[in-house]
């Protein structure tokens, strides 16, 4: 497809994903997979870390991800020697809808939410933990790691993003 981004299969991108017994029985684990691929840790380590630090219940999804990542950034917490840097404008203690940019249409400047496609164009290099409505995935050097449809839905508005350095 024309607007499709490069995609890497989860099994190739995450250490120990194919062999993991936990991964085979999990669902709604997008935050765990994004965490594992962003920080270059194994799936099982990421699963335990997200359960302990983010309060994730098995097969139930992860809630409050943005607040937890902002807290990790504020407290300078590193995982696997890597730190988190929030991108965009910070609104008090949350980062939702922080990635806005100006667009001039017919002489009028308006703010627009950044889409996944625009974000990749503006950030071709680096590792990013990306959150869209109800979902999380990783973008590494312009390559999407997550679900296959994450690479095809380039017009999807982003909620927020964190650079992993």
Feature roles, as predicted:
Residues 1-82, 91:
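Active-site nucleophile-adjacent alpha helix/oxyanion-hole segment immediately C-terminal to the catalytic cysteine
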Residues 16, 33, 96-97, 151-154:
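A generic signature of intrinsically disordered, low-complexity regions enriched in glycine/proline
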Residues 54-134, 140-142, 147-149:
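Conserved active-site-adjacent core of cysteine acyl-enzyme catalytic domains
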Residues 143-165:
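Noncatalytic regulatory segments and standalone regulatory/sensor domains
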